[in-house]
Amino acid sequence: MDFRAGLENVLQQEVTVIHGEETRKLCIANNKYLNGKDADTFRNLAVLLDHLGERSAKAQKLPKPVTSFIKFRNSDQSIFLLSDIPVKKFVILIYMFFRVLGFLKVGRKRLFVHDSKGVCVECIPLCILDFYIHESHQRKGYGKKLFDFMLKTENIQPSYLAIDLPSMKMIQFLHKHYHLINPIYSPNNFVVYSEFFNNLNNSNYSIVQSKLTTTNCFLKSNSSRIHQNKHNHSIVSNNNNNNNNNIIIIIIIQNITHHNNQLTIEQ
């Protein structure tokens, strides 16, 4: 994926980290009329992120991209861009073209995840949200290089991560390069590994609560009562005549399905 000049202020090394907060500031500045050079950078960055999101969605066979400039600038996520920075030619011609080889998007999300024993934990781990390496550069080590850079930057172990809707290729990638086995699927389509729960006290986690259960995850609510509908899913309605302020909402976990959406990566 080649991009013309206009990103030399952004892509200055092999792996560049872009944060949503910084992009928001650039967006605000753009509304206040940037100078020509900064405006060019802003526009090219928007085009780049939109294009990467579209390529990733196409590779995963998703109905729409999960990564776009507008979504990213309104988030607290980070994108790691892997690029092939060309050698400077003389002094005048600097970075005329950029080859972007792929990207990795991470961010923290509040999740309910279950271990193999049925323990339900609400936590805010770092998540792998999108991962794409251009088809012409897969199976050449670029995926691992990008992933390793992210791990070092975030100071985190692979087993501490939650992965959003990983494909079999992603599972194989984690097994091959990081020796992770026996993925644990949660109803929200996130996958974790057993080591995830062994390190819940690690500073990389923010634990909200933990409840022991088998097929149900129990939460507390105020002034509510439970009704079961014909599909066996729990629904909650208010009960003004109920003076009990501490009842339990039961969330029935049923019909867990695994989608075939894929994160395109290099193995």
UniProtKB/Swiss-Prot annotation:
Family matches, as SUPFAM superfamilies: Acyl-CoA N-acyltransferases (Nat) (SSF55729)
Catalytically driven reaction(s): L-lysyl-[alpha-tubulin] + acetyl-CoA = N(6)-acetyl-L-lysyl-[alpha-tubulin] + CoA + H(+)
Residues of the site described as Crucial for catalytic activity: Q60
Residue ranges constituting the N-acetyltransferase domain according to the UniProt record: 1-197
Main EC class the enzyme belongs to: transferase
Domain of life: Eukaryota
UniProt EC number: 2.3.1.108
One annotated GO molecular function: tubulin N-acetyltransferase activity
GO biological process: neuron development; regulation of microtubule cytoskeleton organization
A Pfam family per the record: Acetyltransf_16
This protein's GO CC annotations: microtubule
Gene3D superfamilies: 3.40.630.30
Assigned keywords, A-Z: Acyltransferase, Transferase
Family: Belongs to the acetyltransferase ATAT1 family.
Name of the protein in question: Alpha-tubulin N-acetyltransferase
Organism of derivation: Schistosoma japonicum
